[in-house]
């Protein structure tokens, strides 16, 4: 009798597997993501699943160094292979650097200029001043600065708190003609676009002078309202998309894994159409990200 019960129980488990999706054998390639209950991807497959932990990194994991005339810089994402990262955070293909840059209280940088590099800097903590090519501008949280190649600049922090920025660097190619003056932008003056991927509330930057990037790249501040979830979705070859948390600590659905994402932490979506990403504001606190979309896949 006991044996019959065990056999019946085993058959019931097999039937349940048939209803919910067969447990597949060992796979040789990562399955496509799907919401279907009988999809192969409704099980995890560690042998072939993308190791998404390599694609998310916090600046705290990097050692500080001096750069760009006196900033204290710490890498978040670095050049590498977005399909097979050689180490954590080494996922950049098109841009040169993605990092945190900070000025200590009551300090400033020395004059700095590069003829081959352009910088986008977004303030996420503190306030200060930038001088570039004869222009001056106050900067604070909510603002961004674009510094073209060939323009000398300095930053100043007259306050008693750190000035912290997200710095994105790109190299220009031969024949590229950069702008001749800096651009200053502010997302707080922009009417929001609501509802992309269910829950994103996006604001681009309103610039005094439109920046001229060498890459097909754009930036925006994106929020998610209290207790809401963004649609998990994937990206393919040629898409270099990065999300950096600026405010709040969110939940991140990343492939078939779940992460906390903290301020100063950024992730790049693997461009293989295998890894859905979707952020969740599970709290009653504000959530804000810096979005970067470098869309080489949209070039004709």
Model features per residue range: what roles?
Residues 8-29:
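Bacterial Sec-dependent signal peptides at the C-terminal "C-region" and cleavage site
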Residues 86-90, 108-115, 156-157, 230-236, ...:
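Short histidine-centered beta-strand/loop micro-motifs
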Residues 23-94, 110-111, 160, 168-218, ...:
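A short, N-terminal "cap"/entry segment at the start of jelly-roll beta-barrel domains
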Residues 149-174, 271-298:
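Ligand-binding loop in jelly-roll beta-barrel domains
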Residues 134-149, 256-271:
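Short acidic-glycine-tyrosine-enriched beta hairpin
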Residues 102, 114-130, 221-225, 235-252:
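Short, conserved beta-strand element in jelly-roll/cupin
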Residues 1-4:
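Positively charged n-region of N-terminal signal peptides that target proteins for export
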């Amino acid at each position: 009798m006991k044996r019959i019960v065990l056999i019946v129980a085993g058959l019931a488990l097999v039937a349940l597997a048939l209803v919910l999706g067969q447990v597949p054998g060992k796979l040789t390639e990562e399955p496509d993501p799907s919401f279907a209950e009988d999809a192969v991807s409704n099980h995890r497959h560690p042998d072939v699943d993308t190791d998404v932990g390599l694609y998310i990194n916090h600046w705290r994991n990097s050692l500080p160094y001096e750069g760009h005339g006196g900033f204290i810089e710490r890498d978040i994402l670095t050049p590498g292979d977005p399909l097979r990262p050689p180490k954590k955070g080494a996922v950049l293909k098109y841009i040169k650097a993605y990092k945190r840059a900070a000025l200590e209280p009551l300090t400033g940088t020395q004059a700095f200029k590069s003829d081959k590099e352009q910088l986008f800097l977004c303030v996420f903590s503190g306030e200060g001043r930038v001088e570039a090519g004869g222009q001056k501008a106050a900067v604070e949280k909510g603002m961004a600065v674009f510094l073209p190649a060939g323009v000398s600049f300095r930053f100043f922090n007259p306050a008693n708190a750190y000035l912290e920025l997200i710095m994105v660097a790109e190299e220009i190619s031969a024949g590229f003609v950069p702008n001749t003056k800096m651009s200053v932008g502010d997302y707080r003056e922009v009417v929001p676009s609501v509802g992309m991927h269910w829950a994103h509330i996006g604001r681009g930057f309103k610039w005094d002078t439109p920046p001229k990037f060498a890459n097909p790249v754009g930036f925006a501040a994106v929020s998610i309202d209290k207790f809401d979830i963004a649609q998990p979705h994937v990206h393919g070859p040629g898409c270099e998309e990065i999300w950096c948390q600026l405010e709040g600590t969110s939940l991140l659905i990343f492939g078939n894994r779940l992460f906390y994402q903290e301020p100063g932490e950024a992730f790049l979506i693997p461009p293989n159409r295998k890894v859905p990403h979707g952020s969740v504001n599970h709290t009653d606190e504000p959530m804000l990200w810096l979005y970067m979309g470098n869309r080489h896949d949209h070039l004709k």
